[in-house]
Amino acid sequence: LVTFFAAILWANVATAAVFHSRSEIADLAFPDCDRVETRDVFLSPEQRERIEHAAGSALDGALITIYEGYSGDRLVGYAMLDSHLVRTLSETLLVVLDASGAVAATYVMAFHEPPDYLPGDRWLGLFHDRRLSDDLRVGRAIVGIRNDSSWPGP
């Protein structure tokens, strides 16, 4: 019995993957920028409520970290980490926005579900050039990830 539970625990640990660390955020999000500034923002209850309503999901807390990339004095864009549950385990994405607020890139930083549920580049690309709107969610402009043969794959 102990061996069985140890095998289950090992299987869950074995599927966890960290692809990038926080120290890589600047290079991933803003490879051509000469500086990246980090700002911690404490959201007011009203700001948090607006964000949660727009996103259709709850935030983990009121403190968010925003990374800002600059080329000289020109703001190139923003980046933020988004950690959430996939099924029962978490993933962390790095979402990069250009200066106008459109999605410039999305990176999987860490993924703790089995690899079959890992979003591929093709799926992450569905977010590219999109802005926050009611259509920017799974089931509308974004198709869900499926781990069966009917999904066209990444």
Segments the model singles out, each with a brief description of its role:
Residues 2-92, 98-154:
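Intrinsically disordered terminal and processing segments
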